[in-house]
Swiss-Prot record:
Component of the ankyrin-1 complex, a multiprotein complex involved in the stability and shape of the erythrocyte membrane. Glycophorin A is the major intrinsic membrane protein of the erythrocyte. The N-terminal glycosylated segment, which lies outside the erythrocyte membrane, has MN blood group receptors. Appears to be important for the function of SLC4A1 and is required for high activity of SLC4A1. May be involved in translocation of SLC4A1 to the plasma membrane. The chain crosses the membrane at residues 63-85. Gene3D superfamilies: 1.20.5.70. Residues 1-34, 93-133 are annotated as: Disordered. This is Glycophorin-A. Keywords: Glycoprotein, Membrane, Sialic acid, Transmembrane, Transmembrane helix. The gene is GYPA. Homodimer. Component of the ankyrin-1 complex in the erythrocyte, composed of ANK1, RHCE, RHAG, SLC4A1, EPB42, GYPA, GYPB and AQP1. Interacts with SLC4A1; a GYPA monomer is bound at each end of the SLC4A1 dimer forming a heterotetramer. The keyword Membrane applies.
Length: 133
C-alpha cells in the first residue's frame, strides 16, 4: 500500500506509513527530489503536542456557515423577545384599577343634584338590658 505525501501540503496521517514516496521540490542531478520511506511511523507534531493532521483551518464556506448559524440564532432570540414584549403590551399584568374594574356596576349612577344618604339610618329603638337583681 503506497501512501504518497506531497511536500507542499505539509500534512501527514498519524500511524504507520510504509513504502511512501515523498516528492519535495524539483528533481535535479544533485537532489533527485524523491525520497522513499519504508516501514516507519510518521507523526508530525507541532509545539503543542497535537498531531498536525488534527489541526484544520476553517474554509471560507465553513466560516460563512458558522456566521449564518450565529446570525440565525440571534435573529431567533430577537424575535422571541419581541413576541414576549408584544404579548405583555397586549395583555398586561393584572393590576386592579378602580376605574376599570368590572366590580363597580352602572346601576348606582344617581343625579348629582340629589343628596346622597351616605350615613347609616338613625337607630329607632335602643334596648338596654338591665341585669336581673
Amino acid at each position: 500500500t503506497e501512501t504518497p505525501v506531497t511536500g507542499e501540503q505539509g500534512s501527514a496521517t498519524p500511524g504507520n506509513v510504509s513504502n511512501a514516496t515523498v516528492t519535495a521540490g524539483k528533481p535535479s542531478a544533485t537532489s533527485p527530489g524523491v525520497m522513499t520511506i519504508k516501514n516507519t511511523t510518521a507523526v508530525v507534531q507541532k509545539e503543542t503536542g497535537v498531531p498536525e493532521s488534527y489541526h484544520q483551518d476553517f474554509s471560507h464556506a465553513e466560516i460563512t456557515g458558522i456566521i449564518f448559524a450565529v446570525m440565525a440564532g440571534l435573529l431567533l432570540i430577537i424575535f422571541l423577545i419581541a413576541y414576549l414584549i408584544r404579548r405583555m403590551i397586549k395583555k398586561p399584568l393584572p393590576v386592579p384599577k378602580p376605574q376599570d374594574s368590572p366590580d363597580i356596576g352602572t346601576e348606582n349612577t344617581a343625579d348629582p343634584s340629589e343628596l346622597q344618604d351616605t350615613e347609616d339610618p338613625p337607630l329607632t329603638s335602643v334596648e338596654i338590658e338591665t341585669p336581673a337583681s
